[in-house]
Amino acid sequence: MKTILAVETSCDETAVAIVNSDKQVLAHEILSQAEHKKRGGVIPEIASRAHMEHLSGLIKSAVEKSNLNFCDLNAIAATSGPGLIGGLIVGTMMAKAIAHVAQKPFIAVNHLEAHALVIRLLHEVKFPFLVLLISGGHCQFLIAQDVGKYIKLGETLDDSLGEAFDKVAKMLGLSYPGGPLIEKLAKKGNGTRFKLPRAMIKRSGCNFSFSGIKTAVKNLVQELKMSEQDVCDVCASFQECISDILLDRVSNAIIMAESLNIKINDFVITGGVAANNFLREKLKQHINLNIFFPPNDLCTDNAIMVGWTGIERLQKNYIDPLNFAPRPKWELESY
């Protein structure tokens, strides 16, 4: 059995986990930075300072709760990209320091791969499988062929889906993060009232574009007095629009996989936006594949997914040198 201590500091969550190859989570400590909610978005400098302030305490707490010592660990893993460079440096340097002192292997984890693979901690999802990664910083389709081996089928040409949710929420006067509030208000709204543009729909390929939807919402806000019901109807119409786009793109992704002679049975939808229950249900109803969603706490950023990905990479003997530099931009294809 292998056991890993993992660190996640790529954005505004400071998290530490201890995970083993028997699929047991021995400890998980996470601190979300409330400061960014007051400011309407993540401030990179504030985020990195908070990581420096809290990370060592979370590591100490996780080790104590696991009833292990550093000598009991088989490796130390950290999210080393992509993400905000300040946070990546804090987490990666701390993990490398522990690895050096404890004389344990260091594993640099790609944040995107961690989102893609965490489902295998919970379910018997076998390679190859289709991945839709929808989060605050990323929106892309991938075929996961194996650990460290991916084919990107498409991605956003402008904003990520999470950014679109947050920016639309801000236009409507809602607080950050906007996704949960849009989902809540949409339940009271009429999703057919406003016809928002479905960019890229009915076109070949798997790319996305969400800038036109934002512009359409901005125009609605300027035209209407935006009563409480108007806000609810915009939220509902926005979610309907997004679900139509995702369904269209998924169909194309399946076709692209077939054209590559890759048989896909399992479809994993992950990332922060995958916690949206409306989108989950729409995709479940219309996609004829085995669909898997991580639980909500594993859709958003966490260290459990980093630890499990560390386990998967350790089992392949994918070890990284202690001079590995964090990468704010890191394509999963080149992993």
UniProtKB/Swiss-Prot annotation:
Keywords assigned by UniProt, alphabetized: Acyltransferase, Cytoplasm, Iron, Metal-binding, Transferase, tRNA processing
Record's GO cellular component terms: cytoplasm
Residue numbers binding substrate: L133, I134, S135, G136, G137, D166, G179, N276
GO molecular function, one term: N(6)-L-threonylcarbamoyladenine synthase activity
CDD domains: ASKHA_NBD_TsaD_bac
Segments traversing the membrane: none
Cofactor binding annotation: Binds 1 Fe(2+) ion per subunit.
Family to which this protein belongs: Belongs to the KAE1 / TsaD family.
Name of the top EC class for this enzyme: transferase
Catalysed reactions listed for this entry: L-threonylcarbamoyladenylate + adenosine(37) in tRNA = N(6)-L-threonylcarbamoyladenosine(37) in tRNA + AMP + H(+)
Pfam families per UniProt: TsaD
HAMAP family in the record: TsaD
Subcellular location(s) per record: Cytoplasm
Documented EC number(s): 2.3.1.234
Protein name (record): tRNA N6-adenosine threonylcarbamoyltransferase
GO biological process: tRNA threonylcarbamoyladenosine modification
The protein's role, per its UniProt record: Required for the formation of a threonylcarbamoyl group on adenosine at position 37 (t(6)A37) in tRNAs that read codons beginning with adenine. Is involved in the transfer of the threonylcarbamoyl moiety of threonylcarbamoyl-AMP (TC-AMP) to the N6 group of A37, together with TsaE and TsaB. TsaD likely plays a direct catalytic role in this reaction.
Cited PANTHER family: TRNA N6-ADENOSINE THREONYLCARBAMOYLTRANSFERASE, TRNA N6-ADENOSINE THREONYLCARBAMOYLTRANSFERASE, MITOCHONDRIAL
Cofactor(s) annotated in UniProt: Fe(2+)
Binding site for Fe cation: H111, H115, D301
